[in-house]
């Protein structure tokens, strides 16, 4: 199982200037990927901006959006922006994408929180058209440079359509930031959908969890603040935070047991020292 680390781009105590340094340290420590959190109505840094900063500060580590709220964006603009991040990184971006579950994140006029599944399916076709270099409507020009590619896609969510969509156009699935026993049934659903779609091999199965090597009370408060708008789900997230070295080791075992290909460990605070502390235990 590979071990990635989250960028604290949505931490309420975030100084945005640390994102490049966080990214450099994570790459040097040997983590497999750097992942962002997707949120708009929160005092953080947009995931696309954090990914761009990480792309410029690193050279080998994978970049992952875990997960970006697709239908909250105008599809053409998002596709172009992501192609730019991927290009700057040298082709290291994997797009984790989902529908979104918080009404306050839908801030763009004309893009409300309804009809999200159909909108995402329509948006995906727009992404592919942009990434394939098709001309924009009313223009003789494509929106991306030559050499742009279709980004690998992983989908997050719990609706049956999520797994069908992932099996149809994606590379796999990313679970929510809850304990492994809650994620295991979703992994099983993804494996089943993959086989039913006639796909070869196995889907990528990624998971997300929070860790804290420092003060557990501070960590818990920060995570609780972030999920305050969805308190029932937030309680499930809180039960899965790994505290200290032994907590992290136990967390790793639990996700290995359910067949996780990569576990993204999200920091509970924006303390740069957490990177090395985690690496000593998890890598």
Task: Show where each model-derived region lies.
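Active-site-adjacent structural elements that line small-molecule/cofactor binding pockets in enzymes
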Residues: 1-283
């Amino acid at each position: 199982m590979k071990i990635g680390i989250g960028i604290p781009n949505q931490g309420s105590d975030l100084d945005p200037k640390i994102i490049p340094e966080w990214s450099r340290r994570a790459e040097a420590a040997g983590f497999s990927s750097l992942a962002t959190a997707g949120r708009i109505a929160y005092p953080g840094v947009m995931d696309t901006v954090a990914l761009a900063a990480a792309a410029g500060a690193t050279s080998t580590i994978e970049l992952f959006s875990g997960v970006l709220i697709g239908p909250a964006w105008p599809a053409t603009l998002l596709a172009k922006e992501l192609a730019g991040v991927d290009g700057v990184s040298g082709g290291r971006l994997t797009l984790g994408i989902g529908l979104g579950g918080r009404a306050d994140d839908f801030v763009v006029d004309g893009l409300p929180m309804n009809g999200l599944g159909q909108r995402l399916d329509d948006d995906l076709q727009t992404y592919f058209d942009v990434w394939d270099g098709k001309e924009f409507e009313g223009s003789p020009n494509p929106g991306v440079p030559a050499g742009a590619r279709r980004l690998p896609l992983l989908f997050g969510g719990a609706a049956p359509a999520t797994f069908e969509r992932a099996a149809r156009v994606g590379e796999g699935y990313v679970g929510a930031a809850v304990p492994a026993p809650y994620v295991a049934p979703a992994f099983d659903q993804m494996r089943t959908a993959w086989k039913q779609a006639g796909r070869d091999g196995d889907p990528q199965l990624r998971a997300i969890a929070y860790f804290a090597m420092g003060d557990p009370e501070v960590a818990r408060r920060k995570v609780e603040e972030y999920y305050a708008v969805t308190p029932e789900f937030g309680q499930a997230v809180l039960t899965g935070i790994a505290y200290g070295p032994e907590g992290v080791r136990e967390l790793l075992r639990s996700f290995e047991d359910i067949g996780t290909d990569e576990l993204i460990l999200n920091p509970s605070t924006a303390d740069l020292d957490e990177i090395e502390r985690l690496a000593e235990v998890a890598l």
